[in-house]
């Protein structure tokens, strides 16, 4: 199966699971709480190489994944809806799509609230004040409330890469250095 087909399959699975979770959260009136729990889960995944391995590796059995996720749910006190959802995902051997599920859920929640989503890549974690300022600037440009998904990528060296819909603004130091390098090659 070509890589493009595989990523579309994973994306489709993630969207179906996210849609199911969103509908349950909507019925329970807990979209915000579920979103907060999913943000905590994403932070746990980003902060733990062991958890990343558990999620993506086919070496772990469904039972091992279920036990680990159950322990995680208990330790961090995730809500009943999110806790049960994580256990179902683990039982069905779909933990590898969990980051995609989280992203798809955020998109559904933002759409429900009339927000648009901006994917922001930064060399360093943004402070709360920086995130608020960025949201305000993006709202001024788009005219809509903006939910920001921040990804830290030290390889961009500095600056930001902001994607809103089909538009991308790249003010990263890496891109500026690449542009300068090309300009110097043309001169010399």
UniProtKB/Swiss-Prot annotation:
Cellular-component GO terms for this entry: plasma membrane; proton-transporting ATP synthase complex
Membrane topology listed for this record: Peripheral membrane protein
Keyword NAD assigned: no
Chief site of localization: membrane
Highest taxon in the source lineage: Bacteria
MF (Gene Ontology): proton-transporting ATP synthase activity, rotational mechanism
Disulfide bonds, paired cysteine numbers: none
Subcellular location, record wording: Cell inner membrane
Protein keywords: ATP synthesis, Cell inner membrane, Cell membrane, CF(1), Hydrogen ion transport, Ion transport, Membrane, Transport
Pfam name, any one: OSCP
PROSITE patterns linked: ATPASE_DELTA (PS00389)
Function (record text): F(1)F(0) ATP synthase produces ATP from ADP in the presence of a proton or sodium gradient. F-type ATPases consist of two structural domains, F(1) containing the extramembraneous catalytic core and F(0) containing the membrane proton channel, linked together by a central stalk and a peripheral stalk. During catalysis, ATP synthesis in the catalytic domain of F(1) is coupled via a rotary mechanism of the central stalk subunits to proton translocation.
Subunit note: F-type ATPases have 2 components, F(1) - the catalytic core - and F(0) - the membrane proton channel. F(1) has five subunits: alpha(3), beta(3), gamma(1), delta(1), epsilon(1). F(0) has three main subunits: a(1), b(2) and c(10-14). The alpha and beta chains form an alternating ring which encloses part of the gamma chain. F(1) is attached to F(0) by a central stalk formed by the gamma and epsilon chains, while a peripheral stalk is formed by the delta and b chains.
UniProt similarity note: Belongs to the ATPase delta chain family.
UniProt protein name: ATP synthase subunit delta
Originating organism: Rhizobium meliloti (strain 1021) (Ensifer meliloti)
Gene field: atpH
């Amino acid at each position: 199966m070509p890589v493009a087909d595989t990523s579309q399959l994973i994306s489709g699975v993630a969207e179906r699971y996210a849609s199911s979770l969103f509908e349950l959260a909507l019925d329970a009136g807990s979209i915000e709480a579920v979103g907060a729990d999913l943000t905590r889960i994403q932070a746990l995944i980003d902060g733990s190489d062991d958890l990343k391995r558990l999620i993506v590796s086919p070496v772990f059995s469904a039972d091992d994944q279920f036990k680990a996720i159950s322990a995680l749910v208990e330790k961090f006190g995730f809500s009943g809806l999110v806790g049960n959802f994580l256990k179902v995902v683990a039982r069905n051997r779909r933990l590898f799509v969990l980051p995609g599920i989280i992203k798809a859920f955020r998109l559904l929640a933002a759409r429900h609230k009339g927000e648009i989503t901006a994917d922001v890549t930064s060399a360093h974690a943004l402070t709360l004040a920086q995130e608020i300022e960025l949201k305000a600037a993006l709202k001024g440009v788009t005219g809509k409330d903006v939910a920001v998904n921040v990804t830290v990528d030290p390889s961009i060296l500095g600056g930001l890469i902001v994607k809103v819909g089909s538009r991308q603004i790249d003010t990263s130091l890496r891109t500026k250095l690449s542009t300068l390098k090309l300009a110097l090659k043309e001169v010399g």
